[in-house]
């Protein structure tokens, strides 16, 4: 009988570390809800002791999750474990994940301790975590370069202390599949209490072997795989969960295992992570890249037309990728748009129909026909703009040419006021940004500007993602329009609203602190 492989997602913890700008609590919750809809068994959503923002994110997600088990990371430090437990305690089911370096290199150069010290720290921390929950994971950081005798000793000790999952990370992506599979085999053969815990693997992609290493580990007996959506992560990234999941599905007969993932949510979740994290998916990315199911060779096209199985080992529909349709125009009613969203897997709670339909009509008037990818882009922006806006772009105009300096006029709604400014700049986008900055007077520095097309052809929606630095903090904004200058302006306004909200949070914190002091 096929055994289950537990899918452990760490997009919101290990994956987020690769981003230039941190995700907001709202954005993290969006991703967490998508992961739960996809059916991940465990999601690691943060490192609570690292910052108040991470603590709040973990607590918010823990409160919302109903089916997926929520996990938080902690070093083998008492405070880390206590704070993680506090952030998680509201969850219906949670896991504390403690980790400690075990390789000789890390122990001597980073921890500057002996292996016996590390062994004692691991046992103490696992026991402390067990005081809060019966689900404790222990990770042997840099296990791939840890002497096997030491690895076996610390795994046995951690299990005796109460660890229910033992994670074997290839922290720097150093091992080969043959070598990594051998490590898992050795653990099963040499650790006497290994049957009392689930063996997990967490592979990085520095040598491009994270997925292969993970699958080989599963063949050797590992029953949990850790990774991120789209392979997001530091350096070369983590193991791509969508690749592992589909490899297990396509080769289930050979591997003898399965997952509980809803495969038809893979594509949608991948797209959401890509947009929110401002990390485009390469066209040739396995499973979710735009070319993953494309056939350009004449021989291949002929073979696919005769039988898709000639050159496709899985279908686009198996990951939730629908065929593009051309059925929506400005004459389409609200019910037609709602029906199409339902066909694409969206629920009423995923978007506001009134504002989505208004945006749809404006786009349909410009484009004539609105495609599925247009609707998905509009729904994404719709979700980002649910919170009240202090700033709203009311109007802009630009004059530019090859021999004249670009000039922009902008009208911005600022709370209850409407303010206007004009400015010149090095091109139309810069001119608009200069005018907006004159209105708001926020000290910001543009760190990243990225333009991408949502859709195909000359009338594709232009999506602009920007990252700005404001007083040492980085904020992300996104704008969408058929006009690049307009989408650029909307992206900056989105950033300004995020900065404004952050200021309001700080003001409220200061007010509460002052009230508490007065009460004392």
Swiss-Prot record:
SMART domains, A to Z: LeuA_dimer (SM00917)
Pathway(s) annotated for this protein in UniProt: Amino-acid biosynthesis; L-leucine biosynthesis; L-leucine from 3-methyl-2-oxobutanoate: step 1/4
Regulatory domain: region residues: 392-520
Location in or out of the cell: Cytoplasm
The keyword Nucleotidyltransferase is annotated on this UniProt entry: no
Main enzyme class: transferase
GO MF, one annotated term: acetyl-CoA C-acetyltransferase activity
GO cellular component terms given for this protein: cytosol
Residues that coordinate or bind Mn(2+): 14, 202, 204, 238
Keyword terms: Amino-acid biosynthesis, Branched-chain amino acid biosynthesis, Cytoplasm, Leucine biosynthesis, Manganese, Metal-binding, Transferase
Known catalytic reactions: 3-methyl-2-oxobutanoate + acetyl-CoA + H2O = (2S)-2-isopropylmalate + CoA + H(+)
Location of the Pyruvate carboxyltransferase domain: 5-267
EC number: 2.3.3.13
Cofactor dependence: Mn(2+)
Similarity comment text for this entry: Belongs to the alpha-IPM synthase/homocitrate synthase family. LeuA type 1 subfamily.
Role of this protein: Catalyzes the condensation of the acetyl group of acetyl-CoA with 3-methyl-2-oxobutanoate (2-ketoisovalerate) to form 3-carboxy-3-hydroxy-4-methylpentanoate (2-isopropylmalate).
Subunit structure, as described in the record: Homodimer.
Protein name per the record: 2-isopropylmalate synthase
Gene that encodes the chain: leuA
């Amino acid at each position: 009988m096929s055994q289950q492989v537990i899918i452990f997602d760490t997009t919101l913890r290990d994956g987020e570390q690769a981003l230039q700008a941190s995700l907001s609590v709202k954005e993290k919750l969006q991703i967490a809800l998508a992961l739960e809809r996809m059916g991940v068994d465990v999601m690691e959503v943060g490192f609570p002791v690292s910052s108040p923002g991470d603590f709040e994110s973990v607590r918010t997600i823990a409160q919302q999750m109903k089916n997926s088990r929520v996990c938080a990371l902690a070093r083998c430090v008492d405070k880390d474990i206590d704070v993680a437990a506090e952030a998680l305690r509201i969850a219906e089911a949670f896991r504390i994940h403690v980790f400690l370096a075990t390789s000789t290199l890390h122990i001597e150069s980073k921890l500057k301790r002996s292996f016996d010290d590390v062994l004692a720290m691991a046992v103490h921390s696992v026991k402390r975590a067990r005081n809060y929950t019966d689900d404790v994971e222990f990770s042997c950081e840099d296990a791939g370069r840890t002497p096997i005798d030491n690895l076996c000793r610390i795994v046995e000790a951690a299990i005796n202390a109460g660890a229910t999952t033992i994670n074997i990370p290839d922290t720097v992506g150093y091992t080969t599949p043959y070598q990594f599979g051998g490590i898992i085999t050795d653990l099963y053969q040499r650790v006497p209490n290994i049957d009392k815990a689930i063996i997990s693997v967490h592979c990085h992609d520095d040598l491009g072997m994270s997925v292969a290493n993970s699958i080989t580990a599963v063949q050797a007996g590992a029953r949990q795989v850790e990774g991120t959506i789209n392979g997001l992560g530091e350096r070369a990234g983590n193991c791509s969960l969508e690749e592992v999941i589909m490899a297990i599905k396509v080769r289930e007969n050979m591997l003898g295992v399965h997952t509980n993932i809803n495969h038809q949510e893979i594509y949608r979740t991948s797209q959401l992570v890509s947009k929110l994290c401002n990390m485009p998916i390469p066209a040739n990315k396995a499973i979710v890249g735009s070319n993953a199911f494309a056939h350009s060779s004449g021989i291949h096209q002929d073979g696919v037309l005769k039988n898709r199985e000639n050159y496709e080992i899985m279908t686009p529909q198996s990951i939730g990728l629908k065929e593009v349709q051309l059925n929506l125009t400005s004459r389409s009613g609200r019910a037609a748009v709602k029906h199409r969203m339902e066909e694409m897997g969206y629920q009423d709670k995923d978007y506001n129909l009134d504002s989505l339909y208004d945006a749809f009509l404006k786009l349909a008037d410009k484009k004539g026909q609105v495609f599925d990818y247009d609707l998905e882009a509009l729904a994404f922006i719709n979700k980002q703009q649910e919170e009240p806006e202090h700033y709203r772009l009311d109007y802009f105009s630009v004059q530019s040419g090859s021999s004249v300096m670009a000039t922009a006029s902008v009208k911005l709604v600022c709370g209850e006021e409407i303010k206007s400014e004009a400015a010149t700049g090095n091109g139309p986008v810069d001119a608009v940004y200069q005018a907006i900055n004159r209105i708001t007077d926020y000290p910001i520095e543009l760190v990243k500007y990225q333009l991408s097309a949502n859709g195909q052809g000359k009338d594709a929606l232009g999506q602009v993602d920007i990252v700005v630095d404001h007083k040492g903090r980085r904020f992300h904004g996104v704008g969408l329009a058929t006009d690049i200058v307009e989408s650029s302006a909307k992206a900056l306004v989105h950033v300004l609203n995020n900065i404004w909200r952050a200021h309001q949070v700080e003001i409220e914190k200061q007010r509460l602190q002052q009230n508490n002091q007065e009460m004392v």
